[in-house]
Amino acid sequence: MVPARAELFGSVCSSWNFIRDKSTNCRAYLCHMYTAELIFEHFPELTPKQKEQFERLGPLYEEWNAKINVISRKDMESFYLKHVLHSLGIAKVYDFLPGQVVLDVGTGGGFPGIPLAILFPDTEFHLVDSIGKKIKVVNAVAEALGLENVEGSHVRAEELKYQYDFIVSRAVTHMQRFIPWIKGKLAKKNFDDKRPNGLLYLKGGDLAEELGPLKAQLTHLNQFFSDEFFETKKVVYLTRKEIQGFHAPKVKS
């Protein structure tokens, strides 16, 4: 039984495990998976304001996606799982601090930047993409949610003149092609003595060949999220030092 979209992004179910019989468990599981309840389960310390913002994400993207295709129609059916929760996987690896400035490269419609900005309201997020219509959606969603810590810019990462404490991204391209885009974009002085400035990159699959000589810290997301979607999903952490010292070989297109 697959619920209609109106049901998927309608009022959020108060609980997904309230009845035990098979049919209602199926319906309750779908409700849980397709709404912000999925986020509330994994991040129980959310404030009422943050919960409201996460609840509004689904309808906002459903509305914008009808005008500008920033997320595949198929993926909208599992929006909170494949886009919101996946983005928040970075938060299972690192808690951004108040005052830090984070760059989201190739943000598309706002991922992972928008969900992270909701979770860390005292951290500044600069979301960039080379496609202007996607940034239009980013800024509209941020404004609708009252996210004053988000700025979206229609620009390529290579063209940026600023430096950041962290860079985040989600499977934009081959890692060894990505690294040259962000060289020089990380501040030399660490904001957090416990975690050197660097890149937090969401990526799936076998990364041994792709990472090559890069000394990366890999965190498997299936230790936090049980859905099979996360079976091969990871957060790749690279320090600024590792990024600055990397010389990319030629990568096939």
Model-based region annotation:
Residues 192-206:
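Conserved beta-strand signature within the Rossmann-like core of class I S-adenosyl-L-methionine
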Residues 205-253:
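Active-site capping/gating segments
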Residues 179-196:
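A short glycine-rich, Lys/Arg-flanked "PGG" loop and its adjoining helix->strand segment in the class I
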Residues 30-98, 133-136, 140-148:
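Class I SAM-dependent transferase core
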Residues 88-172, 179:
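Conserved SAM/SAH cofactor-binding pocket of Class I
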